[in-house]
Amino acid sequence: MKIDITLKITPKMATDAQGNEKKALVGHLGTHFDVMNKEFPLEYTKRNGIVFDVSKVKNREIDIADIDMDKVTKNMFVCFYTGFIEEEGYGTKKYFTEHPELSNELLEALLQKNVSMIGVDFAGVRRGKEHTPMDQYCADHGVFIIENLCNLYSVVKADIRNPLRYLLITEQLLRSLSGV
């Protein structure tokens, strides 16, 4: 079974996003990752991965205590399912300004584990003015942030016994497939 975890953008969603997120005007739409000023390594196109269900974490940052760091290994693609993209819907002002965040401590721990990518089902690992600097900080450490994933609940619910697999189509647009 294959599970598509990319967000499909409708014309209405693109219009709404452009009205609520200035970066949407320059291709910062839908499921994507920002290469920042780095080169995306080809070996990153196939990685083991894990999806952590952190959907019960509300009104605070997602922290290191919310996941089992022992399950995270070097070069892994680590995803976080919050349900926010399904609950709020993509493109609203709230979607871009009140989304969940990963704590700086958790991000540092993931960088220390030398993961290759971090995926989230919301607009960014940090909000507002911290968003772009954290994406750059992670990229400087060889880690790319994949934003606006959807359907991660299907991956969590599928109880995958084998590692998550995915395929990157381009550096600007991402189509992630997980093998179950």
Question: Whereabouts are the PLM-identified features?
Answer:
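Active-/binding-site microenvironments in catalytic and ligand-binding cores
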Residues: M1-V180
